[in-house]
From Swiss-Prot:
Domain of life: Bacteria
Family: Belongs to the UPF0235 family.
Source organism (scientific name): Vibrio vulnificus (strain YJ016)
Protein name, per record: UPF0235 protein VV2877
InterPro entries, A to Z: DUF167, YggU-like_sf
Pfam families, per database record: DUF167 (PF02594)
One Gene Ontology cellular component annotation held by this UniProt entry: cytoplasm
HAMAP family assigned to the protein according to its UniProt record, in alphabetical order: UPF0235
Lineage per the UniProt record: Bacteria, Pseudomonadati, Pseudomonadota, Gammaproteobacteria, Vibrionales
């Protein structure tokens, strides 16, 4: 089991390192024990968190309400749960 991504029942749990204010949204790969994701949103007033949940919902083909930030609301290091994903992105599948 990789410490960055694991299955918990039907859910996928991700330990993330977020790079805000990037030129485009992208999964960059492993960053230590975390999956590094670049997002275009700035880390201001929860915009990055909102953008991240919407983006993960799109990538995993679930409603953004099914993406929960479990740890790290205020920092770059986050633990996120995607409830019953309909699809798992190839970059995530490769390290599962």
């Amino acid at each position: 089991m990789n410490p960055a991504v694991w299955l918990d029942g039907e859910d996928v749990v991700l330990r993330l390192y977020i790079q805000p204010k990037a030129s485009r949204d992208k999964i960059l790969g492993l960053h230590g024990d975390e999956l590094k994701i670049a997002i275009t949103a700035p880390p201001v007033d929860g915009k990055a968190n909102g953008h991240l949940t919407k983006l993960l919902g799109k990538w995993f083909k679930v409603a953004k309400s099914l993406v929960t930030i479990e740890k790290g609301e205020l920092g770059r290091h986050k633990q996120v749960r995607v409830h019953t994903p309909q699809q798992i992105p190839d970059e995530v599948k490769a390290i599962l």
